[in-house]
Amino acid sequence: MAAARYWKLVPRGRGLSQNAAAKASATAPEVRDLEVVATPVARYPPIVASMTADSKAARQRRVQRWQATVHAAPSVDEKIRILTKMQFKKYVVHPQISALNADRWYQSFTKTVFVSGLPPAPALSPPPPSLDLAALRAAVCDCILQEQVYVRRRRPRSLFDRRQALASSILDQVVRTLVNLLAPLNPVLSTAALDCKRSVDFYWLRGEERIPAGHRKGHIDALRYQINDKPHNQIRISKQLPEFVPLDYSIPTEIPVMKCKPDKLPLFRRQYENSIFTGSKTADPCCYGHTQFHLIPDRLKRERLIRQNQAEQVEAVFRANAIASLFAWTGAQAMYQGFWSEADVTRPFVSQAVITDGKYFSFFCYQLNTLALTVQADQNNPRKNLCWGSQSQPLYETVEDNDVKGFDDGTLLQIVHFLLNKPREDGAQLLASQEKELDLGP
């Protein structure tokens, strides 16, 4: 039986015949692996996805180029302009909303954990100064009685207008009076900026959705949110309030997870100018928040909710207002310092809030620990924003015969303690103040 035959292809060099090439190949020395010379690096540019293609790689490259543009922005104003210039439909978040359990939805939107009770005072905080409680109580009672007379003279057209005008004027006068009286005890208040009904806006991205219809059907798009808040009064200072807990403080409480879209709250989408605003321009030296004062509208007051068999929603209204308003305020402060979702904060941002319906007051403290709320930035981000809050308590019961009945000193003291909170002094300033106190001692 004949043996099987096969053909072997022999490479032929240029200018050689086939027989000559075969002889040259047979006589050539063997080349081992260690003698192979490394091939030079390719000099052509890397192959990347097209900027205009309809693919995941192309979309990722466009996002990376946009992020690089934000990182390279020369100023904070330019960075905010780039982050807010593209207008898409976004969910408009109202801090004062009548939806049931809105506070749980707002915790999910802002990655905030709510902690019942107020945080303890910082360990290195100085002892509280001695207060003349009787003088403070008399000043607040005078404000209440004075505004009662003025509102009665104006004679609003309806009972609703009268109650809103009375609560608004009382809150305005009480805040101004207490700030002036406490300025000698807290020098920060003497140089602070006191705003009245100033806008506070914040725009951010949180979560994703699949577009159900249209020419972009099936695409994955980010969920966008916008808060347009208007606190009744707010105090801005030039230095930052001290943190309540460390930046990476771990809390075991979980954030509520909402499996429905925000439309079910309900929240509605609108397309208009994106805005990030703390109440002042970026060049303002008073760029940090101290305390906000919010007035609950008449449609959300506890008497109306109790009549509608929604007594459990009374405190939820206060919590939702605090979470949304303080997140927007502290988030805007952080972005004024150059932080955003892809450049997360390196220090906490702290602010306080007092929320009232004219008679009942509730107190909240907020610490912003992260702005990385997008799906990509939040993948390995253990930080959570924290909100502490108290139950609402009355400042007074009623006004009868030009006398304030049932005045609660505890509520007044809590307002005073909020206003006396001040930035932490550095080591040199703290040592100088202690030496001054020793020199002025008995």
From Swiss-Prot:
Could you tell me which InterPro entries the record lists for this protein?
Ribosomal_mL37/mL65 (IPR010793), Ribosomal_mL65 (IPR039982)
**What does UniProt give as GO cellular component?**
mitochondrial inner membrane; mitochondrial large ribosomal subunit; mitochondrion
Alphabetical UniProt keywords: Mitochondrion, Ribonucleoprotein, Ribosomal protein
A GO MF term = structural constituent of ribosome
| The keyword Lipoprotein is annotated on this UniProt entry | no
Q: Record's Pfam families?
A: PDCD9
What superkingdom does the record give? Eukaryota
Q: Its family?
A: Belongs to the mitochondrion-specific ribosomal protein mL65 family.
- The entry's protein name is Large ribosomal subunit protein mL65
Source organism of the structure:
Mus musculus (Mouse)
